[in-house]
UniProtKB/Swiss-Prot annotation, chain B:
Its EC number is 2.1.3.2. Signal peptide: none annotated. PROSITE patterns: CARBAMOYLTRANSFERASE. Keywords: Pyrimidine biosynthesis, Transferase. NCBIfam families: asp_carb_tr (TIGR00670), PRK00856.1 (NF002032). This is Aspartate carbamoyltransferase catalytic subunit. PANTHER family: ASPARTATE CARBAMOYLTRANSFERASE, ORNITHINE CARBAMOYLTRANSFERASE, MITOCHONDRIAL. Belongs to the aspartate/ornithine carbamoyltransferase superfamily. ATCase family. One of its GO terms (cellular component) is cytosol. L-aspartate binds at K92, R177, R232. GO terms for molecular function: amino acid binding; aspartate carbamoyltransferase activity. Carbamoyl phosphate binds at R64, T65, R114, H144, Q147, G273, P274. The gene is pyrB.
Length: 164, 317
């Protein structure tokens, strides 16, 4: 199944191409831990974004906290810019139920009121449980509920998509 | 079985650090680290405990501990109710349980308990419904686990590791629930040498059994230390026959710049507060470059947030 998924780096390049025509230099890029940050860092370079890349860990905003508790390794969010009235490109690796994106938007608003938020994902795998749609998706495919798409990063920085 | 843990190892209550596994302590400290960022944001709140009701049940007054628990709970978006209940015959045994039953009927989710009697938090924890967690905010001479944890958090932040440290706890160990919690945490986290320093009248008999070295002389006890933890001296100890006078105590066991110079040059100085300046610690030391007393207060909020979040969500280790 692994071999059937496209190369992640090719997908990121494709994603950057689709974003570029409407990407303003003052836009800030924010990735969602962990995979979204890896993708955001690549997009940041490809789109020649002027502001530093931001990172969100949405663990404190999850709607399933009371059921499953805290993720054991919460990383602090890092937004090294003022969000007020900024255009934000929110980036995640895989869009599934939409709950992670909802949590990320809730957290962003605790840092300020952005002018707008646009969503870019590497893969839109379907299975949405909330009315959330990506503005940019490099790959759209239907994946059965029992399967997961994972983005992993090797020590040399190489990104790989796998289906399990 | 440890009453603080569920059969599958999750944290159910926090009553004492005695007997808690190292992995649990480390998990709490790691979680606190992730909460540090929240206090520095413009909106100092996360929605983790939204809709939860936390009752600060203080049978013994303590403004600072109560306030830090309250801030921590509010930063987690919980609803907090403070109950300061004067210690009297009304706060013993069945009367305490009546209070707890009433608050449980108001759909409490967590009790933060301070009481002058050792074991009060355990007593309440044995009684509460399964969905309610109890945090001991200090009981008699027994334990003050969140203070112990915030001290460990402070040490880790300034020293990085525990395995190569010499830590001295100075003062009234006999009456100190804080010292007991510190000793349990330090030994569990692998500090190779924990020293207690104080006059014979203020050190418990057999304290060596807790795995500490005993010193009655500050110069010998402080030599080569990485961390110096000063304890608060309660005024009532002066009135009893345990100590001749505050001046005499300060002369032998007060931390002055001269005595601190005997520890390692990069040693940090800690104090659980509130301080008696000129009794257990000199102002030059309390406000000096080696003092980490104010960071301790800041860290206390993150640590208490971590404890409450893990209790409410389950602390799987």
């Amino acid at each position: 199944m692994h071999a059937s998924l496209p190369d992640a780096n090719t997908l990121i390049a494709r994603l950057a191409e689709s974003i570029a025509p409407t990407f303003a230099p003052e836009t800030v890029i924010v990735g969602i831990h962990s995979g979204g940050v890896w993708v955001a860092e690549r997009l940041h370079a490809l789109l020649k974004c002027a502001s530093p890349v931001g990172a969100l860990d949405i663990s404190f905003y999850r709607d399933d906290f009371s059921r499953i508790g805290l993720h054991p390794q919460v990383k602090p969010s890092n937004l090294p810019f003022d969000l007020e009235n900024r255009v934000i490109l929110l980036v995640d690796d895989v869009l599934h139920t939409g709950r992670t994106v909802r949590a990320a938007m809730n957290e962003l608003f605790d840092y300020g009121r952005p002018a707008s938020i646009r969503l870019a994902v590497l893969v839109d795998r379907g299975g949405r449980e909330l009315p959330i749609r990506p503005d940019f998706a490099a790959l759209t495919l239907e994946v059965p509920p029992h399967q997961n798409i994972n983005l992993s990063r090797l020590d040399d920085g190489h990104l790989t998509l796998s289906l399990a | 079985m440890n009453p603080q843990l569920t059969p599958d190892g999750r944290l159910r209550h926090l009553l004492t650090l005695d007997g808690l596994p190292r992995a649990t302590l480390t998990h709490i400290l790691d979680t606190a680290e992730s909460f540090m960022d929240v206090g520095e944001r413009e909106v100092k709140k996360v929605p983790l405990l939204r809709g939860k009701s936390i009752f600060n049940l203080f049978f013994e007054p303590s403004t600072r501990t109560r306030t830090t628990f309250e801030i921590a709970a509010k930063r987690l978006s919980a609803d907090v109710v403070n109950l300061n209940i004067a210690t009297s015959s009304q706060t013993k045994g069945e009367a305490i349980l009546d209070t707890v039953d009433n608050l449980s009927a108001m759909h409490a989710d967590m009790f933060i308990v301070r009481h002058s009697q050792s074991g009060a938090a355990h007593f309440i924890a044995r009684h509460v419904a399964p969905h309610i967690s109890v945090v001991n905010a200090g009981d008699g001479r027994h334990a003050h686990p969140t203070q112990g944890l915030l001290d460990m958090f402070t040490i880790r932040r300034f020293k990085g590791e525990f395995h190569n440290l010499t830590v001295a706890i100075v003062g009234d160990v006999l009456h100190s629930r804080v010292a007991r919690s510190q000793i349990h945490a330090l030994t569990t986290l692998g500090v190779p040498e924990v020293r207690v320093i104080g006059p014979k009248t203020l050190l418990p008999t057999g304290v060596e059994q807790l795995g500490v070295k005993v010193f009655h002389d500050m110069a010998a006890g402080l030599a080569g230390c990485d961390v110096v933890i000063m304890l608060r001296l309660q005024n009532e100890r002066m009135k009893g026959a345990r100590l001749p006078s505050a001046q005499e105590y300060f002369k032998f066991f007060g931390l002055t710049p001269e005595k601190l110079a005997l520890a390692k040059p990069d040693a940090i100085v800690m104090h659980p507060g509130p301080m008696n300046r000129g009794v257990e610690i000199a102002s030059e030391v309390a406000d000096g470059p080696q003092s980490v007393i104010l960071p301790q207060v800041t860290y206390g909020i993150a640590v208490r947030m971590a404890v409450m979040a893990l209790l409410a969500g389950g602390a799987s280790t």
